């Protein structure tokens, strides 16, 4: 498993806030670094898939367990 450089706890936030906060957090990371996002909004699955495709970032992993969605996103160039 990839070790994240930073973690964003977006649990309890509804669409579009998890993606908005992730975008702000990604601005702090360097190219190739990995952000882990924790969210509870089921809509975040499609949101993160679409956002990473549109933004040039790479969705490395997407998992769900105990009501928490965990995403690993590698920052693009």
Give the label of every model feature segment.
Residues 4-11, 36:
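Short amphipathic
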Residues 16-58:
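Amphipathic, hydrophobic secondary-structure cores in small proteins
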Residues 49-77:
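C-terminal structural segments of small proteins and small subunits
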Residues 1, 11-13, 31:
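Residue-level detector of transmembrane insertion/anchoring sites
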Residues 1-5, 76-77:
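Compositionally biased, disordered extreme N-termini, encompassing classical targeting presequences
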């Amino acid at each position: 498993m990839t070790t994240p450089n930073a973690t964003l706890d977006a649990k309890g936030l509804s669409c579009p806030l998890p993606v908005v906060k992730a975008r702000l957090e990604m601005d702090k990371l360097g190219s190739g670094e990995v952000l882990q996002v924790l969210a509870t909004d089921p809509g975040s699955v499609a949101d993160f898939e679409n956002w990473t495709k549109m933004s040039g970032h790479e969705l490395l992993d997407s998992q769900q367990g105990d009501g928490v969605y965990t995403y690993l996103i590698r920052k693009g160039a």
